[in-house]
Design a protein with these regions (language model features):
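Conserved HGGG/HGGXW glycine-rich cap/lid loop of the alpha/beta-hydrolase fold
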Residues: 21-67
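Conserved acidic catalytic loop of the alpha/beta-hydrolase fold
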Residues: 77-94
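Gly/Ala-rich beta-loop-alpha elbow adjacent to hydrolase catalytic centers
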Residues: 98, 102, 106
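Flexible "cap/lid" loop of the alpha/beta hydrolase fold
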Residues: 119-151
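Conserved alpha/beta-hydrolase catalytic His-Asp/Glu region
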Residues: 155-216
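Short beta-strand/loop motif that positions the catalytic acidic residue
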Residues: 217, 223-225
Length: 287
């Protein structure tokens, strides 16, 4: 086992290392961020979750402090990496929460079976169709180009309520209320992610998300959706439930694409309530 210089832990996954942080004690809970994010995407709820759970928040390959995969970057290959990570750390059956792309990832792992316990999927991507596909791709692609171009002045922009509103209007129902630190961390992570462009294209135009027959997922499965999501529109929840008929849908009112930003306390309660129903055998790794 290797330790990063900044005190965060790293675990070898195939021919690379996966960076992650751990906080709290209790039944393990895995957090998986969205495209362009990192473990810091969970800062608004991480400490509250850690009061009751041992939280393990990862940086997926090609994001945060984890090196990219050597081959194709897709939901499938990222799922393979997470599966290997869990197996090597005695975390099979761990409860998991995903956000955005990470929300689709935990749904795919639930579909595969035998990997996760209870699952909470927050505003998952992958359930768009028709005009929504190019809208997702081009709007996010334009956003990342702008974010990269503005990096020299990003601290000043994120320190302003007006700047945060302009930057995060598509992602948050109340972007001006985001803390400057969280906003800056997210914009830095977006700009510095080497796997962003390839994964974005594959999310939009790659493999479509497969579903499961009813009664095939035995563990609790909850899909949370913001009523004001402008990235993955609320109407997409219909297809998500068609493909995952065992899931229960939770609506976040007056909430955008990231419930952990707009509705942190409600998100914490949803996660704890949804995952407490399944006491699995996952144990924390001895690191």
């Amino acid at each position: 086992m290797q330790f990063a210089a900044n005190g965060q832990n790293r675990v070898e996954v195939i021919t690379m290392e996966m960076n992650y942080i751990r906080r709290g004690s209790g039944k393990p809970l895995l957090l998986i961020h969205g495209i362009g994010g990192s473990w810091r995407s969970w800062q608004t709820i991480l400490d509250d979750l850690a009061i009751e759970r041992e939280v393990i928040a990862v940086d997926l390959p090609g994001f945060g402090d984890t090196p990219p995969l050597s081959g194709k970057v897709s939901i499938r290959t990222l799922c393979d990496a997470v599966t290997r990570f869990l197996g090597e750390n005695n975390l099979n059956g761990v409860d998991a929460v995903g956000s955005s792309m990470g929300a689709r990832l935990v749904l795919e792992l639930a579909r595969r079976g035998g990997v996760l316990g209870s699952v909470v999927s927050l505003d998952p991507g992958g359930f768009w169709k028709g005009w929504q596909i190019p809208f997702f791709y081009h709007s996010v692609n334009l956003s990342i180009k702008l974010v990269r171009a503005l990096q020299p002045v990003m601290p000043q922009i994120t320190n302003s309520a007006i700047g945060r509103t302009l930057l995060f209007e598509q992602f948050s129902a109340r972007p001006w209320k985001l803390s400057p630190k969280i906003a800056l961390d997210e914009m830095r992570s977006f700009a510095e992610s080497p796997s962003f462009d390839e994964l974005l294209y594959n999310l939009a135009y790659g493999e479509t998300q497969k579903g499961t027959p009813k009664d095939s997922i035995k563990k609790p499965l909850v899909i949370g959706w913001g009523r004001r999501d402008r990235v993955c529109f609320p109407s997409q929840s219909k297809l998500a439930l068609e493909k995952f008929p065992d899931a229960k849908l939770h609506w976040f009112e007056r909430c955008g694409h990231f419930p952990q930003w707009d509705k942190p306390q409600e998100t914490v309660r949803l996660i704890l309530d949804s995952t407490s129903k399944n006491v699995n055998k996952a144990v924390s790794a001895s690191i």
